Amino acid sequence: MPKYNLLEAMKEQKRTDAKLTDKKQKIMEAAITLFAEKGYGNTPTSEIAKAAGVAEGTIFRHFDTKDHLLVSLIVPFLKDSIPLMAEELFEKLLSNHGLGFEDFLRNLLRDRLLFLKQNREIFQIIVKEFFYNEEIRHELMPYVAENIGSRLVQVIRAFQERGELADRPAEAMARHIFFSIGGTFILKFVFGLNGSRDEEAEIESAVRFIMDGVRNR
Protein backbone atom coordinates (compact mmCIF):
# COMPACT_ATOMS: atom_id res chain seq x y z
CA MET A 1 0.00 0.00 0.00
CA PRO A 2 1.31 3.52 -0.74
CA LYS A 3 2.45 5.74 2.08
CA TYR A 4 0.37 8.77 2.98
CA ASN A 5 1.74 10.94 5.76
CA LEU A 6 -0.66 13.82 6.42
CA LEU A 7 2.00 16.15 7.78
CA GLU A 8 4.21 15.66 4.73
CA ALA A 9 1.21 16.23 2.46
CA MET A 10 0.36 19.42 4.35
CA LYS A 11 3.93 20.63 3.99
CA GLU A 12 3.80 20.10 0.22
CA GLN A 13 0.45 21.89 -0.01
CA LYS A 14 1.33 25.10 1.76
CA ARG A 15 -1.64 27.41 1.79
CA THR A 16 -2.00 31.11 2.45
CA ASP A 17 -5.08 32.63 3.98
CA ALA A 18 -5.74 36.33 3.51
CA LYS A 19 -7.72 36.36 6.77
CA LEU A 20 -4.65 35.40 8.83
CA THR A 21 -2.26 37.93 10.31
CA ASP A 22 1.32 37.76 9.09
CA LYS A 23 2.53 36.35 12.42
CA LYS A 24 -0.15 33.67 12.55
CA GLN A 25 0.62 32.63 8.97
CA LYS A 26 4.34 32.35 9.80
CA ILE A 27 3.60 30.29 12.92
CA MET A 28 1.42 27.87 10.98
CA GLU A 29 3.95 27.51 8.14
CA ALA A 30 6.79 26.90 10.60
CA ALA A 31 4.70 24.37 12.52
CA ILE A 32 3.79 22.39 9.39
CA THR A 33 7.42 22.25 8.28
CA LEU A 34 8.76 21.17 11.69
CA PHE A 35 5.95 18.69 12.40
CA ALA A 36 6.59 17.06 9.03
CA GLU A 37 10.36 16.94 9.48
CA LYS A 38 10.63 16.00 13.18
CA GLY A 39 7.21 14.68 14.15
CA TYR A 40 4.58 16.40 16.26
CA GLY A 41 5.77 15.00 19.59
CA ASN A 42 9.40 15.93 18.92
CA THR A 43 8.70 19.57 18.09
CA PRO A 44 8.59 22.00 21.05
CA THR A 45 6.74 25.28 20.68
CA SER A 46 10.01 27.12 21.39
CA GLU A 47 11.43 25.70 18.16
CA ILE A 48 8.30 26.68 16.21
CA ALA A 49 8.59 30.21 17.59
CA LYS A 50 12.26 30.44 16.59
CA ALA A 51 11.53 29.22 13.05
CA ALA A 52 8.61 31.65 12.71
CA GLY A 53 10.62 34.58 14.09
CA VAL A 54 8.20 35.26 16.94
CA ALA A 55 8.22 35.01 20.72
CA GLU A 56 6.94 31.71 22.14
CA GLY A 57 4.21 33.61 23.98
CA THR A 58 2.88 34.81 20.62
CA ILE A 59 2.05 31.21 19.70
CA PHE A 60 -0.07 30.83 22.83
CA ARG A 61 -1.86 34.12 22.17
CA HIS A 62 -3.02 32.72 18.83
CA PHE A 63 -3.39 29.04 19.85
CA ASP A 64 -4.15 27.96 23.42
CA THR A 65 -2.04 24.80 23.18
CA LYS A 66 0.19 22.97 20.73
CA ASP A 67 -2.69 20.52 20.16
CA HIS A 68 -4.93 23.42 19.11
CA LEU A 69 -2.23 24.62 16.73
CA LEU A 70 -2.18 21.20 15.06
CA VAL A 71 -5.98 21.10 14.89
CA SER A 72 -6.01 24.57 13.27
CA LEU A 73 -3.72 23.15 10.60
CA ILE A 74 -5.26 19.74 10.06
CA VAL A 75 -9.00 20.56 9.97
CA PRO A 76 -8.88 22.85 6.88
CA PHE A 77 -6.53 20.37 5.19
CA LEU A 78 -8.87 17.45 5.88
CA LYS A 79 -11.90 19.39 4.63
CA ASP A 80 -10.04 19.99 1.36
CA SER A 81 -8.62 16.46 1.14
CA ILE A 82 -11.35 14.08 2.37
CA PRO A 83 -13.29 14.02 -0.96
CA LEU A 84 -10.24 13.03 -3.02
CA MET A 85 -8.88 10.68 -0.34
CA ALA A 86 -12.23 8.87 -0.15
CA GLU A 87 -12.52 8.63 -3.93
CA GLU A 88 -9.01 7.20 -4.30
CA LEU A 89 -9.53 4.75 -1.42
CA PHE A 90 -12.76 3.28 -2.76
CA GLU A 91 -11.47 3.16 -6.34
CA LYS A 92 -8.45 1.18 -5.15
CA LEU A 93 -10.49 -1.19 -2.98
CA LEU A 94 -13.08 -1.86 -5.70
CA SER A 95 -10.64 -2.20 -8.61
CA ASN A 96 -10.89 -6.01 -8.35
CA HIS A 97 -14.45 -6.60 -9.56
CA GLY A 98 -14.43 -10.24 -8.46
CA LEU A 99 -13.79 -9.32 -4.84
CA GLY A 100 -16.32 -10.46 -2.24
CA PHE A 101 -17.47 -8.15 0.54
CA GLU A 102 -15.43 -9.95 3.20
CA ASP A 103 -12.24 -9.37 1.20
CA PHE A 104 -13.26 -5.76 0.54
CA LEU A 105 -13.62 -5.30 4.30
CA ARG A 106 -10.31 -7.02 5.00
CA ASN A 107 -8.47 -4.79 2.51
CA LEU A 108 -10.17 -1.70 3.91
CA LEU A 109 -8.95 -2.54 7.42
CA ARG A 110 -5.42 -3.24 6.21
CA ASP A 111 -5.28 0.02 4.26
CA ARG A 112 -6.58 2.16 7.13
CA LEU A 113 -4.33 0.38 9.64
CA LEU A 114 -1.29 1.37 7.59
CA PHE A 115 -2.63 4.91 7.17
CA LEU A 116 -3.15 5.35 10.93
CA LYS A 117 0.24 3.89 11.80
CA GLN A 118 1.73 6.69 9.69
CA ASN A 119 -0.54 9.33 11.28
CA ARG A 120 -0.90 8.06 14.85
CA GLU A 121 -0.28 11.40 16.61
CA ILE A 122 -2.74 13.28 14.42
CA PHE A 123 -5.37 10.56 14.87
CA GLN A 124 -5.00 10.66 18.66
CA ILE A 125 -5.47 14.43 18.78
CA ILE A 126 -8.37 14.51 16.30
CA VAL A 127 -10.20 11.78 18.27
CA LYS A 128 -9.70 13.73 21.50
CA GLU A 129 -11.06 16.88 19.86
CA PHE A 130 -14.05 14.93 18.52
CA PHE A 131 -14.89 13.88 22.07
CA TYR A 132 -14.59 17.33 23.61
CA ASN A 133 -14.97 19.90 20.83
CA GLU A 134 -18.44 20.16 19.32
CA GLU A 135 -17.27 22.71 16.74
CA ILE A 136 -14.75 20.24 15.29
CA ARG A 137 -17.44 17.54 15.07
CA HIS A 138 -19.76 19.91 13.21
CA GLU A 139 -16.95 20.94 10.84
CA LEU A 140 -15.74 17.47 9.87
CA MET A 141 -18.69 15.09 10.20
CA PRO A 142 -20.57 16.37 7.10
CA TYR A 143 -17.46 15.70 5.00
CA VAL A 144 -17.07 12.21 6.47
CA ALA A 145 -20.76 11.40 5.99
CA GLU A 146 -20.94 12.74 2.43
CA ASN A 147 -17.69 11.31 1.11
CA ILE A 148 -17.16 8.12 3.12
CA GLY A 149 -20.58 7.19 4.51
CA SER A 150 -22.38 7.63 1.20
CA ARG A 151 -19.79 5.57 -0.69
CA LEU A 152 -19.96 2.79 1.89
CA VAL A 153 -23.75 2.71 1.54
CA GLN A 154 -23.39 2.32 -2.24
CA VAL A 155 -20.92 -0.54 -1.77
CA ILE A 156 -23.26 -2.28 0.68
CA ARG A 157 -26.20 -2.01 -1.72
CA ALA A 158 -24.11 -3.46 -4.55
CA PHE A 159 -23.16 -6.47 -2.45
CA GLN A 160 -26.76 -6.83 -1.25
CA GLU A 161 -27.81 -7.14 -4.89
CA ARG A 162 -25.25 -9.93 -5.27
CA GLY A 163 -26.80 -11.71 -2.31
CA GLU A 164 -23.74 -11.49 -0.05
CA LEU A 165 -25.21 -9.17 2.57
CA ALA A 166 -28.42 -9.25 4.58
CA ASP A 167 -31.49 -7.44 3.27
CA ARG A 168 -31.50 -4.66 5.84
CA PRO A 169 -31.24 -0.86 5.54
CA ALA A 170 -27.84 -0.11 4.03
CA GLU A 171 -27.48 3.05 6.11
CA ALA A 172 -27.80 1.08 9.36
CA MET A 173 -25.28 -1.49 8.15
CA ALA A 174 -22.87 1.29 7.16
CA ARG A 175 -23.10 2.73 10.68
CA HIS A 176 -22.40 -0.72 12.15
CA ILE A 177 -19.31 -1.08 9.94
CA PHE A 178 -18.11 2.49 10.44
CA PHE A 179 -18.34 2.40 14.24
CA SER A 180 -16.88 -1.11 14.44
CA ILE A 181 -13.83 -0.08 12.43
CA GLY A 182 -13.57 3.28 14.21
CA GLY A 183 -13.85 1.61 17.61
CA THR A 184 -11.19 -0.93 16.72
CA PHE A 185 -8.72 1.77 15.72
CA ILE A 186 -9.53 4.09 18.64
CA LEU A 187 -8.90 1.25 21.11
CA LYS A 188 -5.61 0.42 19.38
CA PHE A 189 -4.14 3.83 18.62
CA VAL A 190 -5.69 6.10 21.27
CA PHE A 191 -6.11 3.86 24.32
CA GLY A 192 -3.36 1.37 23.53
CA LEU A 193 -5.67 -1.62 23.81
CA ASN A 194 -6.00 -4.47 21.30
CA GLY A 195 -2.22 -4.26 21.32
CA SER A 196 -1.51 -7.62 19.72
CA ARG A 197 1.65 -7.74 17.66
CA ASP A 198 -0.21 -9.98 15.23
CA GLU A 199 -2.00 -7.30 13.24
CA GLU A 200 -3.45 -9.82 10.79
CA ALA A 201 -5.13 -11.58 13.74
CA GLU A 202 -6.57 -8.22 14.86
CA ILE A 203 -7.90 -7.60 11.35
CA GLU A 204 -9.45 -11.06 11.11
CA SER A 205 -11.14 -10.60 14.49
CA ALA A 206 -12.65 -7.29 13.34
CA VAL A 207 -13.74 -8.82 10.01
CA ARG A 208 -15.50 -11.71 11.77
CA PHE A 209 -17.27 -9.35 14.17
CA ILE A 210 -18.52 -7.11 11.36
CA MET A 211 -19.50 -9.96 9.04
CA ASP A 212 -21.55 -11.59 11.81
CA GLY A 213 -23.73 -8.48 11.75
CA VAL A 214 -24.10 -8.03 7.98
CA ARG A 215 -23.76 -11.44 6.30
CA ASN A 216 -26.73 -12.87 4.40
CA ARG A 217 -27.68 -16.08 6.19
Where are these regions (language model features)?
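Short hydrophobic clusters on alpha-helical segments that form packing/core surfaces
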Residues: 27-35, 112, 210
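Helix-turn-helix
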Residues: 26, 34-68, 72
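Amphipathic alpha-helical packing segments from all-alpha helical-bundle domains
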Residues: 103, 114-118, 125-127, 134-162, ...
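Amphipathic alpha-helical segments used for helix-helix packing
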Residues: 85-94, 115-136, 184-189
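N-terminal intrinsically disordered/low-complexity leader segments
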Residues: 1-22
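Hydrophobic/aromatic-rich alpha-helical bundle segments in the mid-to-C-terminal region
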Residues: 138, 160-208
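Hydrophobic alpha-helical connector segments
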Residues: 87-118, 174-177
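Short, basic, alpha-helical segments at the C-terminal edge of helix-turn-helix-like DNA-binding modules
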Residues: 75-81, 86
